[in-house]
Structures are given as C-alpha cells and as structure tokens.
A protein has these predicted regions:
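Charged, E/D/K/R/S-rich low-complexity terminal regions of large eukaryotic assembly subunits
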Residues: 1-155, 160, 164-452
Length: 452
C-alpha cells in the first residue's frame, strides 16, 4: 500500500515497514513525539490507526487542543478516533485562564522595569504558546526577550528557543540566523550546546537539499549530544541523517576520513548499525550489498518527519556515485558483469548509464550490441601541449603589458581629464629623453601619439 509524502509529490511505499511505534517514541520528548506520530498517520495507512491512538494519548497529556482536533480530522471514519469535546473545552478554558495570568504578570513586570522579570515573562508566554502548538506566537514571544537579555546565557537560551520554534514551523531561515548568533556568544563553545546547534544546522541544510553541508554538520556533532536534544532529533537521527547524506555526497577519501574512521561519529553509528554496514560496503566496493542495506531501510526512512522528502534523491545520488566509482578505474567494462555486481538487469543498467553519460557524470560510450561500456579518455599529451601553449601566451601578454607600463611611467605619460591635455609637459619630455627608455622606438615613438 502506498501513500503520498507531506509535500504531495513523492510516492511513499511504507507497507513493508516494521517500525515499532512505541519503541520509536522512546527516542523523543516534548511536542515532537505527537507531531512525528501525526506525520506517520498521515503518510502510512498501515500505521494510521496505531499512530493516531498513540498520538491522541500523547496530546492529551498536553494542552495542544489544536493538534488533537487535527488528529480527529485525520482519523476520519476508519481511524478509530472519536472527538472528546469535554476534554477540549476543559483544556481550552484552563489554558485561557493561564494565558490571562501570564499576560497580567508580564504587564506588572513592564511597570516595574526589571529587565530580568520582563525577559522571564516573555519566555513563559513563549513556552505557553509552544506547548499549545501555536509556534508562530511562541516565536514572537521568544524574539521579544532579545532586548532584555543581560548575559550570554540569556542570549543562548533565547537563540535555542527561537531555533526550536522555527524548526517546528519549518522556518529554517530563522534557524540559520540564530545558530550564527548563538555560536558568536562567549559561552557558545559548550560541547552540549555546540552539538545541539550542529544538529539544527544539519536539519537546515538537509531541508535546503545541501546534502554535503548537512553531512558535515551531522558528522561534526560531538558525542556529548546524548539525549539533550530529543525534543528535536535523537542521536539515532544524527547517525541516520549524517550517514545517508555522506554516502550521497562525499568522495571516497572524505567518506573514510569523516564517517568510517571518525572516532567521534562511531558512537552514533553504533546506534544505527545498518547505516554503518552500508558505509563499509560502499567503501569496500560491495555496491550490491550497500544498496540492499539501504533498500531495507527505505520504508522506515519514508516515515521520518525530516527525511521523507529527500529519500528518493539521496538514494539516487548514492546509486549514481556507486556506478561512477565502479567504472572509473577501467577503460572498458562488460555491462553484464556490472549488472551482476549491482544486482540489476542489463537493460535497466544501460538506461542508468545512458543518463549518467548525458549528465556528464561518466565520460564514456555504450556499445549496445556487445553490451560494453567504453571510456572516453582525453588525449593527455595533446592536453598538456595545449596547456603549455596557453601558459606561454599568457606569459607573453603579461610581459608586454609590464614593459608598456614601465615605458609609460618613465615617460611620465598620463591621460588627464577633459580639457587638460594629454601627455607630459615639455620639460618632462626632455627629462625622459635623458633616461634609457625600454621602448624600441624610443621616447619620441611613445610621444608620437601626442601630435606636435
């Protein structure tokens, strides 16, 4: 059974996913638990009923009635979720009372002009709206605390609050801006803080489809992250996002240095052994095994809140890289053997190779009759001579330009503004003639352009 991704574009086959929802939830805290379950329910019919039940139970521990009503609407007739109007009315009434108190307290703090109290008042209001699921209002409250921050710790707390609200909204421009602000504060070098900021930066680059930059951020996350950022992403997510983006974008040397042999990231890879095995298989040129590992992961990855829109592109990039890397050492390749190595049919492989050739990722031509791929290697000797001639021409041009400049300077020859004449004065000419100019025609030759 297939569903459609959150952006309505990518078909998502999640029927073979064996995701244990209750075990999955243990990796997260806060509002992201219910939001991830709601997303799973929206894209995976096989998981819809269980995900909705867990999400509704999770939401009822909070004051987020808006998300609860979304879950009820998503449930429809077959989701098994009925609307609890009594709970909604009770929570909304209590929430309004708390909101009135928070706003009253904030007004009192503004009257007293105590900056710390005003900052805390805005933060409490932001936390209230964040729990209610009104991330836009929460963001505005968090941003207002900026004018009342008196220490670097206050600035960092403000930045982290803005970042988490912006991530929930999908506003990654704000995320990037406030990451930079947090990193520039005096206390911005704390390992746990750096870990959280790098995770947020990785998510921003992932959303922008800048997979290489995303991989570098995720792979630079220190082990101190632990579960400190589970309201946004888990340590398992770091291993998954970082490993997959690295496989899709890193070259062989960078993959080994920054992923496979990186001592800091090994801690994360231990949490996701399938990604570790896929990376090792890719580096060891066991491409069929690597791609098989990734295919087993695909159904679960399509259920991920942040990764789902990128799975197809990332997988295509990994496969293209594998094909290019397999072919690169050879002059000719038997496509039948290559098809066996990639566990694919020859006709299908030929179409993939043709696309890579058209995209100029492989310099080769296909012999469809013999099923052989021939490399198109450039004539290195001709290329070397051409480069040498080009360098010589550039040297001659630069030398002539320098000689001309020297002669002009010796002649005191300048171009002045309109109406002020051209060239040096008579005395300057006489002085120039007393020197030994480089110009083969002499100074008079240079001055000939002046006229009498």
């Amino acid at each position: 059974m297939a569903a459609t991704s959150g952006n309505g574009q990518e078909p998502m086959d999640t029927s073979s996913s064996l995701l244990d929802l209750e075990a999955y939830l243990t990796n997260y805290t806060g509002v992201t638990r219910a939001r991830r379950l709601a997303f799973i329910a929206s894209v995976s019919p096989p998981h819809k009923r269980d995900a909705l039940a867990l999400a509704a139970a999770e939401v009822k521990r909070t004051t987020n009635t808006a998300l609860y009503l979304e879950l009820v609407a998503l449930s429809g007739d077959d989701g098994g979720l009925s609307r609890d109007d009594g709970w909604v009315e009770q929570v909304d009434r209590k929430a309004q009372q708390r909101l009135d108190k928070l706003e009253s307290d904030l007004n009192g703090h503004k009257t007293s002009l105590v900056k710390e109290s005003i900052r805390m008042g805005h933060t409490d209001l932001g936390d209230f709206h964040y729990e209610r699921g009104d991330f836009n209002t929460a963001l505005k409250c968090y941003v207002r605390t900026r004018d009342y921050c008196t220490t670097s710790k206050h600035i960092i707390a403000m930045c982290l609050n803005v970042i988490k609200a912006s991530i929930q909204m999908g506003n990654f421009t704000h995320v990037t801006n406030y990451i930079t602000k947090a990193e520039s504060t005096p206390d911005g070098s704390d390992p746990t803080l750096l870990a959280q900021l790098r995770v947020a930066a990785g998510l921003a680059f992932l959303e922008a489809k800048k997979y290489k930059l995303a991989a570098r951020k995720f792979l630079d996350v220190p082990p101190e992250l632990g579960s400190s950022y589970s309201e946004v992403a888990s340590a398992q997510d770091v291993a998954l996002y970082g490993g997959l983006c690295a496989l899709a974008s890193f070259d062989r040397a960078e993959l080994k240095a920054k992923l496979i042999d990186a001592p800091g990231f090994k801690t994360f890879l231990e949490l996701y052994p399938q990604v570790r095995e896929a990376a090792h298989d890719f580096f060891q040129s066991r491409y069929a095994s690597c791609l098989a590992h990734l295919e087993k992961l695909r159904p679960d990855l399509l259920l991920d809140l942040h990764l789902h829109d990128h799975v197809k592109q990332l997988y295509d990039d990994v496969r293209s890289k594998a094909l290019v890397q397999y072919f690169s050492p050879f002059v000719t390749v038997d496509m039948r053997l290559m098809a066996t190595a990639f566990n694919v049919g020859v006709d299908g492989l030929e179409k993939e190779l043709a696309k890579l050739i058209m995209d100029k990722q492989i310099a080769a031509r296909i012999d469809s009759q013999a099923k052989v791929l021939h490399a198109r290697h450039a004539d290195q000797r001709t290329a070397t001579f051409a480069a040498a001639l080009k360098m010589g021409d550039e040297y001659m041009r630069d030398t002539k330009a320098m000689l001309l400049r020297i002669n002009l300077m010796r002649a005191d020859f300048i171009v002045k503004g309109e109406g002020q004449g051209i060239g040096p004065s008579k005395s300057s000419r006489q002085e120039a003639r007393a020197t030994a100019p480089f110009h083969p025609a002499g100074i008079d030759g240079l001055m000939a352009m002046e006229g009498p």
